[in-house]
Curated annotation (Swiss-Prot):
Induction annotation: By bacterial infection.
Gene Ontology BP terms: defense response to Gram-negative bacterium; innate immune response
GO cellular component, as recorded: extracellular region
Organism field: Palomena prasina (Green shield bug)
Stated role: Antibacterial peptide active against Gram-negative bacteria.
Keywords: Antibiotic, Antimicrobial, Immunity, Innate immunity
Name recorded for this polypeptide: Metalnikowin-2B
Amino acid sequence: VDKPDYRPRPWPRNMI
């Protein structure tokens, strides 16, 4: 399960 967005990532979650 992907962790909630606690910190902004350089790429969208869709890419992961």
